[in-house]
Amino acid sequence: MVKRFSWLVFCLLFSVGITAKGGGRQYNSYKGLVMAGYQGWFNAPDDGANRGWYHYTGHDGFRPGSCTIDFWPEVSEYKRLYKTEFKFADGTPAYTFSSHDESTVDTHFRWMKEYGLDGVFMQRFVGEIRGESGLKHFNTVLNS
């Protein structure tokens, strides 16, 4: 049953045409295209989503010794940043981004365009959009 459902999802995903956001260009096939998945699931307490440090938070919040990220993001090109409890070796505070900000999504898509990606699949996990908070957040990201 799971195998059949997975095949159905695969067929549905690949049977629809792709439209680029800016130009409205329609592709008839995925052959030769470079596609990516986009989650957009990071939040910060002051981003307006009311989800706190979502997807950054470890077993005891988002603070030194408790986080779920493997690497600190390079944030120099983001327009809006959020101060964290983390500090760099020189003692300066570490900042990060929120996917809830339209400017963050714009930055990510600009990077993908600059590096030659042809399109993106917006990934929406059922467990993430089951509640109103998650649904509102991911709709905001999708509409950005």
Question: What is the predicted function of each stretch?
Answer:
Residues K3-F10:
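Sec-dependent signal peptide recognition
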Residues C11-T19:
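Hydrophobic h-region of N-terminal signal peptides that target proteins for export
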Residues M1-K3, A20-G22:
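Secreted/periplasmic carbohydrate-active enzymes, especially glycoside hydrolases
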Residues G23-S144:
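Glycan-processing catalytic domains of CAZymes
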